[in-house]
């Protein structure tokens, strides 16, 4: 008998149009093996990753666009063990709504590890700059710039979550999953610049603002 693969429910949330479905579909096996749960209108993609401690799997719950019609039902969040909140760096309103998604998620799942992802960093007209991305620091989340269409930083959120869930900072991915070929290319120099800007921004004190709505 082969050992059971540790499997974790991951909820993927954020405004409609931020690239959540594009992101999850990059992982080809997960896309091939996805299942549709009609009762709550969700697609579940089983994303497997190979680590130096064996295989780990995330059952990624994708909302299939329901968030466009208001909030998601609690049934979507129940028993989630980790989460990714996504916004679009070309759309300020999607970042402004991040606290609402975070509130809904932690109301049902209190102390789960969560990664905040700013998607579409391949687009030149970036609106949400590093210095304005502070929510993750207030709430102790991890943050990554990503570009779903180019696969840039695709594995980063999953690796961070895997380490948290396994309680092992030494965990590494030893083989890359098969990903859909990039539809766009990122500018490597620009990505390095963004990373430096993020590091510099993280070193700054958090702005004094009214946290009542965050």
Curated annotation (Swiss-Prot):
Xref: Pfam families? Ras
CDD domains annotated for this entry?
A: Ran
Q: Which GO terms describe its molecular function?
A: GTP binding; GTPase activity
Q: Where is this region: Switch-I?
A: 34-42
**Record domain Small GTPase Ran-type: where:** 4-168
**What's this protein's function?**
GTP-binding protein involved in nucleocytoplasmic transport. Required for the import of protein into the nucleus and also for RNA export. Involved in chromatin condensation and control of cell cycle.
> What does the record note on quaternary structure?
Found in a nuclear export complex with RanGTP, exportin and pre-miRNA.
Protein name per the record: GTP-binding nuclear protein GSP1/Ran
Which species does this protein come from?
Answer: Candida glabrata (strain ATCC 2001 / BCRC 20586 / JCM 3761 / NBRC 0622 / NRRL Y-65 / CBS 138) (Yeast)
Q: Which gene encodes it?
A: GSP1
